[in-house]
Amino acid sequence: MKKTPENPTICLNMIVKNESHIILRCLESVKDMIDYWVISDTGSTDNTQQIIRDFFTEHQIPGELHEHPWKDFSHNRNLALELARDKADYLLMMDADDQFIHPPNFRFSNLTEGSYYINCVLKNITYARRHLIRTDLPWKWEGVIHEYLECNQPYTTPIYPDGYIIASTEGARGQNPDRFKDDIEVLKAALQDEPDNTRYQFYLAQSYRDDGNYEQAMIEYQKRADMGGWEEEVYYSLFEVGRCQARLEKPFPQILEALLKAHYYRPIRLEALHYAVVMCRMSGQYHLGYHLGIHHIETPVPENDVLFLASDVYQWKMKDEIAVCASWIGRKPQAKELFTELSQMDNLPEEDKTRIIDNLKIC
């Protein structure tokens, strides 16, 4: 099933387990852009398999449903990948709780690269994830958890310009109340075998944070930062050290030092600096907050960064914080100018827009 790069064939590739409550939304979002599907079920006890069969029968899309016992994420994803490798020009990787948002009559076109990132949105965080891979390259999943695609031949991975994926934690894995504790044990064991694996170390820190253990998360994030490697991940680890300190109510100077260390490590990113300004405002340090952030209110979203971009920080949140600080230190005209600009934006949450309009009235 091969076509030209202008009109490539696409095969949906997934692993699923007990996704009956969510799977239809995902399938509906991709049905018009795929030519084939290969899905591996890893042990569903609900009617996930029947829903998949019925859906693709109704829409007359050929494909295959397989069953494989569960071992770990990379093992099971690799089984599904190998079964799909000869079915199309490209594989589209999706999770059951993903939803592809795209223009009407959308099809992937002009595909020539070895793989493509697709922008993903999880709450207010934007990141890019490799979702499309060319099947004539030896792709393989790596990692027992938080798995990723790797290839031992040269390839390029641009961001596909159209469409984006709304990610969530509504799938079966996300419903497990002990998910983060389970992940911690898996990652600790994996790090015993691969102590220099920076990805495992990063997600160990993430798992401690998500489980609410900020003290241990802070330690693990610092370990990850000290390991070096991918600059975006080092930056985010340093940022989270500061955020964990804030959650633990460490002294203000200590928190500020950690956040500024993160910012100066990667100054094209604003998340850490924005959080520092927030901490200044909350501590009544309005002059300090103003001077830290005033020269960064027009900083654009970095074009080539892909890890956990808080796009709202760049779009409006930094300006909002600086406007508040400006109003407190007597710079009313500047505060009014910023609040006016913010009040005219269309993408603000309603409660924030109401607050900003109220602030504008008293400038």
Predicted features and spans:
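"A position-specific structural signal for the A-helix of alpha-solenoid helical repeats
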Residues: 203, 240, 275-278, 321, ...
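Short, well-formed alpha-helical segments that are part of the catalytic scaffolds
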Residues: 14-36
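Conserved donor nucleotide-binding strand/loop of the catalytic core
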Residues: 50-79, 83
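Residue at a conserved register position within TPR or TPR-like alpha-solenoid repeats
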Residues: 208, 245, 276-280, 326
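A conserved acidic beta->alpha catalytic loop
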Residues: 29, 39-52, 69-70
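Acidic helix N-cap motif at the loop->helix transition within catalytic regions
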Residues: 24, 46-55, 103
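Catalytic-site signature of metal-activated, phosphate-bearing donor transferases
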Residues: 1-2, 9, 74-82, 88-94, ...
